[in-house]
UniProtKB/Swiss-Prot annotation:
Record flagged with keyword Transferase: yes
Lineage, top ranks: Bacteria, Pseudomonadati, Pseudomonadota, Gammaproteobacteria, Moraxellales
EC number per UniProt: 2.1.2.1
Full protein name: Serine hydroxymethyltransferase
Gene Ontology cellular-component terms listed: cytosol
Biological process, per Gene Ontology: glycine biosynthetic process from serine; tetrahydrofolate interconversion
Cofactor: pyridoxal 5'-phosphate
N6-(pyridoxal phosphate)lysine modified-residue sites: K229
Family of the protein in this entry: Belongs to the SHMT family.
Record's keyword terms, sorted: Amino-acid biosynthesis, Cytoplasm, One-carbon metabolism, Pyridoxal phosphate, Transferase
Residues reported in the UniProt entry to bind (6S)-5,6,7,8-tetrahydrofolate: L120, G124, H125, L126, S353, P354, F355
Gene name per UniProt: glyA
Record pathway: One-carbon metabolism; tetrahydrofolate interconversion; Amino-acid biosynthesis; glycine biosynthesis; glycine from L-serine: step 1/1
């Protein structure tokens, strides 16, 4: 019986929720910087019988039989990622970016070793030393921030803290920073104190693959990333390195140190994603992602809203609402009512709690996949400001929602109207 089961017939409640989410994605504008729309080919790979196969170990060195075909799948993903990023070593087994980071900690550090990373309210990630995360609970985490007034990474502070605390590992990377990171400066600082340099490029991996953002691979000892976001693949993770000196440690940290069997259907989807990213049109897409972000930033700033660091050189921006005396939670709700999805986000020295915040983060990967150009991105930024200026006024929200519905029909996600 199970061979013929369909979700619609067997589990209509689940089917209804899934269908509703498909409708939401088609009819709402997605501006969460970490979200994107993957291709039908990526989704097709994830929905195959590869999901049935257990394959502990690595290609050619498995603990289970019957892995000759999944070995081909995983090796394809590895080889394509190496070509895409110019890395000598790649591990495509991490289930997420956080698990990739966790594996690097396990490979390179001992418990209570000192790590230096960007603080959450400056734009860092939980796994960069936040006190509520494994990286802050199990290690001595020291945090750097931004230059007050400019919103740029305070490299002098990074250097000063590195000299003072002698970290075993320095983490460069971010989840809410809109400028270009100076990877070479981080390398210099790491070398000064004899630290490993880990770069978490999760947010900008697609931009790097597309040649519109500098690559950290020549500078870092280890690079981690997710494979969704700007890379437009499945929700998963990956580890890269510039040479194979650390390969054995990293492989052992992923399996058996941090995970059991890899998700072969997801690894197949990564292989598809990397092949897509090697195409010439992927570069054009990434160029448009940045153009759209800059078009939005200009309108938002012209309308009187502050963007931390004064603009954007990548796919995202962090908007401070302190001057407007509104919270990120309010803005998130008001824009959501207009069918524009963003996320509330802390700003530097945020007086509000992480559940409320004083800012919102927006990004352009998803709208660019959808087909937005600079003019349409600028219009969208204006609609956002209209809703915020009105503090969620029902009439203004309804007017903007109508505009959102119209452009969503004009630019469907998967070339079909729901």
């Amino acid at each position: 019986m199970f061979k013929d089961i369909s979700i619609k017939d067997f589990d209509p409640v689940l089917a209804e929720a899934m269908a509703a989410e498909s409708v939401r994605q088609e009819n709402h504008i997605e501006l969460i910087a970490s979200e994107n729309y993957c291709s039908q080919a990526v989704m097709e790979a994830q929905g195959t019988d590869l999901t049935n196969k257990y394959a502990e170990g690595y290609p050619g060195k498995r603990y289970y039989g019957g892995c000759e075909h999944v070995d081909v799948v995983e090796q394809l993903a590895i080889d394509r990622a190496k070509e895409l990023f110019g890395a000598e070593y790649v591990n495509v087994q991490p289930h997420s970016g956080s698990q990739a980071n966790s594996a690097v900690f396990l490979a390179l550090l001992e418990a209570n070793d000192t790590v230096l990373g960007m603080s959450l309210d400056a734009g860092g990630h939980l796994t960069h030393g936040a006190h509520i995360n494994f990286s802050g609970l199990n290690y001595n985490a020291v945090q750097y921030g931004l230059v007050e007034g400019t919103g740029l990474i305070d490299y002098d502070q990074v250097e000063s803290l590195a000299k003072e605390h002698k970290p075993k590992m320095i983490i460069a990377g971010f989840s809410a920073y809109s400028q270009v990171v100076d990877w070479a400066r981080f390398r210099e600082i790491a070398d000064e104190v004899g630290a490993y340099l880990l770069v978490d490029m999760a947010h900008v991996a697609g931009l790097i693959a597309g040649g519109v953002y500098p690559s950290p691979v020549p500078f870092a000892d280890v690079v981690t990333t997710t494979t969704h976001k700007t890379l437009r693949g499945p929700r998963s993770g990956m580890i890269l390195a510039r040479d194979e000196v650390l390969a054995k440690k990293l492989n052992s940290a992923v399996f058996p140190g941090n995970q059991g069997g890899p998700l072969m259907h997801v690894i197949a989807a990564k292989a598809v994603c990397f092949k897509e990213a090697l195409e010439e049109n992927f570069k054009t897409y990434q160029q448009q992602v940045v153009k759209n972000a800059q078009a939005m930033a200009k309108v938002i700033q012209d309308r009187g809203y502050e963007i931390i660091s004064g603009g954007t050189e990548n796919h995202l921006m962090l908007i401070s609402l302190v001057k407007q005396e509104m919270t990120g939670k309010e803005a998130d709700k008001w824009l959501g009512d207009a069918h524009i999805t963003v996320n509330k986000n802390a700003v530097p020295n945020d007086p509000k709690s992480p559940f409320v915040t004083s800012g919102i983060r927006i990004g352009t990967p998803a709208i660019t996949t959808r087909g937005f150009n600079e003019a349409q991105a600028g219009d969208l930024a204006g609609w956002i400001c209209d809703v915020l200026d009105s503090r969620g006024d029902e009439a203004v929200t309804a007017e903007v929602r109508g505009k959102v519905e119209a452009i969503c029909k004009e630019l469907p996600v998967y070339a079909k109207n729901q």
